[in-house]
């Protein structure tokens, strides 16, 4: 399956004439491929020929991580929400299947977003680097995680100016908070 899902193969398929007017991706994918497929879908967002809608059945716990909000934000949530409006449509209990799997499932709906960073590969890459650094050690403070890429004094000044505690953890920040941090600490 990974061979079929290689980004080059997907690009080849979607650049065919059948997909030039937009397309939707709908699937009940093997759960072990969820993060791999999400990364591919995120990579497609900066391309011209991207899906208009993605609907997937995934493991319930993964779906909950994708749509998480503060104080339960995580790397997957921030990045997915950067590219998509994300929503759980329905929970599918394991008892609805025969034989029943070990976990409950959820149907998620992902609608691609347009923002200034996705259309600029350099900014997109820098934003992703910022968020990855911020979540590099989720139990540590944002300040400790980001000081590897941004001077500590600059982070402290930003946090104080925006009435955020110096001990704030990355999970307490929304996507909007991350975008503001990016604008003020990385772009300036």
Predicted regions mapped to residue ranges:
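Catalytic cores of RNA-modifying enzymes
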Residues: 1-132
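C-terminal beta-strand-rich structural cap/linker in extracellular carbohydrate-active enzymes
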Residues: 167, 171-188
